[in-house]
Amino acid sequence: NNLWYESDVLLVKKDGKYGLINYKGNELLKCEYNSITTLKGIKNSLITDKDGKLGLVDDIGNIVIPNQYKAIKQLGNKYEEGFIVQNEKYGVINWDKSVALEAKYDEVKQIYGNGRFVVKQDGKWKIVDTTGNSYLEEKFDDVKSINWENVVIQKNGKYGIMTISGD
């Protein structure tokens, strides 16, 4: 969970709280956090814990997601792909701070494609887009990947490919 060296940021501790400075010693983020950790393998994304609530900052101290969640995890392999957030329910927040999916789902998988996400709601898996349209409701047990209009699904222990329209 080391901070990336090439990001020119250092973790500092003052009076039992953590913050960030750059290599010149300039403060990037005040020492007011219980902890600051990286998202494993994701650059420019630091999880902050403030009084038991998690948030996310970039490597120059800009707040991307305020400290108001129980859990935050990356959606994909790059920070630009967004983050899954959780309190009582799950949702998705984009890097630009916009809400991609309202936090109303029982689960959001770390699989998405072409603006669509795999979610569980009321015990059933489905695919939704950012405008709230639902696809393939109750048509699968699991989704392995989404590639444009094609979805690799698992149903009754068997794998197959469906289009987003159900063909």
Stretch-by-stretch model annotation:
Residues 1-167:
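Residue-level detector of conserved, function-critical positions
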